[in-house]
């Protein structure tokens, strides 16, 4: 590292001394970052933030004295800064984490498994990557509205859109979406305006097992389309969005005239499973001109090559613009590779998608 480069200063907040020690060890082992201080609870953290002015905060979601969400909400209102949440692999933990992302947290990691060395190298790399991305992220000062308020605003009020069971119903047009850091909120903003009869949406969001089901359930309460975690072999239907499970790649397949969701436990691609590239490439192969590709905020380059393949197969492609991205990594790579037809702000993405679909009319290409 160049001597003039400053290390990323990280403040770790966790009520477990063991977790604080382990996080400190991992972060301090990286050449470009260091733990400037640790805190056992948000009240201590508040004073340490004033003292050390950290670049990134890692924050446990559940702590004594002050709840992690309460602290995050106050922090993002009074002193917005990049926050990476540290969450347990429980249903409650995943729900709290998703709420934290709504409030403005940049990303999250699961808690390290104390005493288990297997997988620790991979965990260390992921934590370091997320801290680096957070240090460069655009932090939103104004948090998103609560889920209930957002649902009411979209006229859904938590009711799931009805499932379509008619065996003659098919979906020819498809919306294929990939995202990483900042993607949970970006996906919410893309999906909530879609009408109940929108084409099917397939989504690969970098997220660990245990979180995607809660993510899908949360979106299902906000959207006019049905949102669910994808299941292997199920038909892909209009008015539905299918989110790749955190443990598997999601691919588009065909069975006669129908599109089918296919799950694969093949090794990670671009260090991710689910991988955006895997989903995009399957869409290029099986949907061709019938698909729209959308790459949203995220670090790294996953999805860039696959989006180019979609474009070469005739799909129209979108990328989120830099100003509205939390991290402009994946869209930047896709644009640089020449795989993007239209660069759009997040606030206008759904409108542009629906306008493009309308321009396609009924001229569906058979593949």
From Swiss-Prot:
What is the official name of this protein in its record?
A: Protein-glutamate methylesterase/protein-glutamine glutaminase 1
Instruction: Write out the annotated subcellular location.
Output: Cytoplasm
Name the reaction it catalyses. [protein]-L-glutamate 5-O-methyl ester + H2O = L-glutamyl-[protein] + methanol + H(+); L-glutaminyl-[protein] + H2O = L-glutamyl-[protein] + NH4(+)
Where does the Response regulatory domain start and stop, copy by copy?
9-126
**Top-level division of the source organism's lineage:** Bacteria
What is this protein's function per UniProt?
Answer: Involved in chemotaxis. Part of a chemotaxis signal transduction system that modulates chemotaxis in response to various stimuli. Catalyzes the demethylation of specific methylglutamate residues introduced into the chemoreceptors (methyl-accepting chemotaxis proteins or MCP) by CheR. Also mediates the irreversible deamidation of specific glutamine residues to glutamic acid.
The record describes its post-translational modification as: Phosphorylated by CheA. Phosphorylation of the N-terminal regulatory domain activates the methylesterase activity.
Biological process annotations from GO: chemotaxis
Active site positions, chain numbering: 180, 206, 302
- UniProt entry keywords in alphabetical sequence: Chemotaxis, Cytoplasm, Hydrolase, Phosphoprotein
**Annotated source species:** Burkholderia pseudomallei (strain K96243)
SUPFAM superfamilies recorded: CheY-like, Methylesterase CheB, C-terminal domain
Q: Which residues carry this modification: 4-aspartylphosphate?
A: 60
Q: InterPro entries from the xrefs?
A: CheB-like (IPR008248), CheB_C (IPR035909), CheY-like_superfamily (IPR011006), Sig_transdc_resp-reg_Me-estase (IPR000673), Sig_transdc_resp-reg_receiver (IPR001789)
GO molecular function annotations of the record:
phosphorelay response regulator activity; protein-glutamate methylesterase activity; protein-glutamine glutaminase activity
Sequence ranges assigned to domain CheB-type methylesterase in this UniProt record: 168-360
């Amino acid at each position: 590292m160049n001597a003039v480069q400053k290390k990323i200063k990280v403040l770790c907040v966790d009520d477990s001394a063991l977790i604080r020690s382990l996080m400190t060890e991992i972060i301090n082992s990286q050449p470009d970052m260091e733990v400037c201080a640790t805190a056992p609870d948000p009240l201590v953290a508040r004073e340490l933030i004033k003292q050390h002015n950290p670049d990134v905060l890692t924050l446990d979601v559940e702590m004594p004295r002050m709840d992690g969400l309460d602290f995050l909400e106050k922090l993002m209102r009074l002193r917005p800064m990049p926050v990476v949440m540290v969450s347990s692999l429980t249903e409650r933990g995943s729900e709290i984490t998703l709420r934290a992302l709504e409030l403005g947290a940049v990303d999250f990691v699961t808690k390290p498994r104390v005493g288990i060395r297997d997988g620790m190298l991979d965990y260390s790399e992921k934590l370091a990557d997320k801290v680096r991305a957070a240090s460069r992220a655009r932090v939103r000062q104004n948090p998103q509205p609560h889920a209930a308020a957002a649902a009411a605003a979209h006229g859904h009020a938590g009711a799931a859109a009805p499932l379509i069971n008619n065996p003659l119903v098919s979906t020819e047009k498809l919306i294929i979406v990939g995202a990483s850091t900042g993607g949970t909120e970006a996906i919410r903003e893309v999906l909530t305006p879609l009408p109940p009869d929108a084409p099917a949406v397939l989504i690969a969001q970098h997220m660990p097992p245990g979180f995607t089901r809660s993510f899908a359930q949360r979106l299902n309460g906000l959207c006019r389309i049905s949102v669910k975690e994808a299941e292997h072999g199920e038909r892909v239907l209009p008015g539905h969005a299918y989110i790749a499970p955190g443990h598997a790649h999601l691919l588009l397949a065909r069975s006669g005239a129908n599109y089918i969701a296919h799950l694969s436990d093949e090794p990670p691609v671009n260090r991710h499973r689910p991988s955006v590239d895997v989903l995009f490439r399957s869409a290029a192969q099986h949907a061709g001109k019938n698909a729209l590709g959308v790459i949203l905020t995220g670090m790294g380059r996953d999805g860039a090559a696959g989006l180019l393949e979609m474009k070469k197969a005739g799909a129209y492609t979108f990328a989120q613009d830099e100003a509205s991205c939390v991290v402009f990594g994946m869209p930047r790579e896709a644009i640089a590779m020449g795989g993007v037809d239209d660069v759009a702000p997040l606030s206008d993405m759904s409108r542009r998608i629906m306008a493009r679909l309308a321009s396609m009319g009924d001229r569906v290409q058979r593949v």
